[in-house]
Amino acid sequence: MATKKAGGSSRNGRDSAGRRLGIKKSDGQYVIPGNIIVRQRGTKVHPGINVGLGKDHTIFSLIEGRVEFLTKQNHKIVNVKEIANV
């Protein structure tokens, strides 16, 4: 007689890799056109002045400048402020 009951096979044990979402450039950081500022699912952060919104809701810089995050009416907004030429 077997002393061990037959083990069933588990249907768990898979996991997908992380999607590398989040803020890529922080407040006050220097960016050039095309730099990704935020990677997100949906608009957790809304686009403001001098930034574009990709079809996957990625926010990216349209100009050279500094990143600025602010909150207006419970919406997080990201802008890029142009740097004054000295």
From Swiss-Prot:
Entry's family note: Belongs to the bacterial ribosomal protein bL27 family.
Keywords linked to the UniProt accession: Ribonucleoprotein, Ribosomal protein
Disulfide bonds: none
Residues spanning the signal sequence: none
GO biological process, one term: translation
Protein encoded by which gene: rpmA
Keyword Cell division: no
Gene3D superfamilies, per database record: 2.40.50.100
GO CC entries: ribonucleoprotein complex; ribosome
Protein name: Large ribosomal subunit protein bL27
Keyword Protein transport among record annotations: no
A GO term, aspect molecular function: structural constituent of ribosome
SUPFAM superfamilies found in the cross-reference section: Ribosomal L27 protein-like
InterPro entries for the chain: Ribosomal_bL27, Ribosomal_bL27_CS
Residue numbers spanned by region Disordered: 1-26
